[in-house]
Regions:
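Basic, glycine/lysine-rich polyanion-binding surfaces/domains
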Residues: 1-187
Length: 187
């Protein structure tokens, strides 16, 4: 109940580092992602995030995922933890018909989700990440502490919230700062 109340009334933090991340790049990156993804991303602006599914040819679900458009030729896919190996193998198999490079970066990134009505304020005060410019389902990259983070206004709690992707060292440090700031750990 304490975790629920923190997210509904203030702010809670979730360690979601178990999620998988796949980078797709190359001259046919948009064409490839359009092919494997159910949502229409053709001509999408850089900085936009889409939720949808990857489907088998018979219409069965491979997995649901988030697609981040990093550049016209670069996309960041966030897949479910239990399906990382299966999903990546499927993505690689589909990619053979396209001029793209796929990279499983699941071991590279850690991720925290800061959720609740005070999450924007806490992101700025505690982590120095100003996010008032982010609309829901958009992201930006932020250079801080010697690395580039991916910061998105996303989440599944029904409250305002943010997800931060960075090195495991950065995420561990951010977690410590948030807990020291009084943010409730959740999940």
């Amino acid at each position: 109940v304490d975790e629920h109340n923190a997210v509904r009334k203030a702010c809670g933090v979730f360690d979601v580092s178990h999620m998988g991340e796949v980078l797709v790049s190359g001259p046919e990156a948009e064409k490839f992602v359009q092919y494997i993804f159910t949502n229409d991303i053709a001509g999408a602006p850089v900085g936009k995030i889409y939720y949808g599914m990857m489907l088998h040819e018979n219409g069965g679900t491979v997995d649901d995922l988030l697609v981040y458009k990093m550049a016209d030729d670069k996309f960041f896919l966030v897949i479910n933890a239990a399906n990382i190996d299966k999903d990546y193998a499927w993505i690689e198999a589909q990619a053979k018909a396209f001029d793209v490079v796929t990279e499983n970066q699941s071991d590279t990134y850690g991720q925290i989700a800061l959720q609740g009505p005070e999450s924007e304020k806490v992101m700025a005060e505690c982590l120095g990440l100003v996010c008032e410019d982010l609309a829901f389902y958009t992201f930006k990259t932020v250079d801080t502490e010697g690395e580039t983070l991916i910061v998105s206004r996303t989440g599944y709690t029904g409250e305002d919230g943010f997800e931060v992707y960075g090195s495991h060292a950065y995420i561990q440090g951010a977690w410590g700062k948030l807990i020291a700031h009084g943010v409730k750990p959740c999940g």
